[in-house]
Amino acid sequence: MKALKIALTKGRLEKDAVALLEKAGIDCSSMTDKKRKLIFHSSTQPISFILVKAVDVMTYVKHGVADIGIVGKDVLMEASKSHYEMLDLEIGKCQFCLASTPDFDPSSYRRKIIATKYPTVASKFFREKGEDVEIIKIEGSVEIAPVLDLADAIIDIVETGSTLKENGLIIYEKMYPISARLIVNKASLKQNKTQIFHLIDQLEQAIKEELAE
């Protein structure tokens, strides 16, 4: 039986994803002592794990290097490309928010300047509202943009809101909820249908148990 390759997002989401996989009965013990390794193998199942950056999960799945990927909905939305999304994993929950300083007027007709790491998501949001805005892409700490008068407001991912508060910002609008999603390579799904659907069944059961706790 061919080993399924699962691309996991490095970082915060990795920890939650591994915990969910373990709860679903997937052995991930090889990942506990990873050092500089980026490829791991389950000792009990024909499954391998690849640790990559979030945006690269989609690339590995698209090209069939990975059969399955676990990645945040925010990354999928910003990529705005077609991905075969099969399951909401109910982990890594947060949301896109519009935030700024207390003196910001969201109802102003003046053309606003919006700073964000997610220009595609921001454009979609304001287009749906019928607003014409200027969008500035920022790769680093976007929270300081309104404070330094680079932008009128920001669009960013918010989990607890503590970082916004620490920088004197408040949330003006909650936009889109986000969580980790399981995406699948379409060719892999045809070739490994039984294996992939068995894994999905295991994950669905683990998610139900997690939500019931």
Curated annotation (Swiss-Prot):
GO biological process: L-histidine biosynthetic process
A GO molecular-function annotation: ATP binding
Pfam families: HisG (PF01634)
Protein location: Cytoplasm
Catalytic activity as recorded in UniProt: 1-(5-phospho-beta-D-ribosyl)-ATP + diphosphate = 5-phospho-alpha-D-ribose 1-diphosphate + ATP
Enzyme class, first EC level, given as a word: transferase
Pathway as given in its UniProt record: Amino-acid biosynthesis; L-histidine biosynthesis; L-histidine from 5-phospho-alpha-D-ribose 1-diphosphate: step 1/9
EC number: 2.4.2.17
Record's keyword annotation contains Transferase: yes
Biological role stated in the UniProt entry: Catalyzes the condensation of ATP and 5-phosphoribose 1-diphosphate to form N'-(5'-phosphoribosyl)-ATP (PR-ATP). Has a crucial role in the pathway because the rate of histidine biosynthesis seems to be controlled primarily by regulation of HisG enzymatic activity.
Recorded domain comment: Lacks the C-terminal regulatory region which is replaced by HisZ.
Record protein name field: ATP phosphoribosyltransferase
Species the sequence originates in: Listeria monocytogenes serovar 1/2a (strain ATCC BAA-679 / EGD-e)
Gene name of the record: hisG
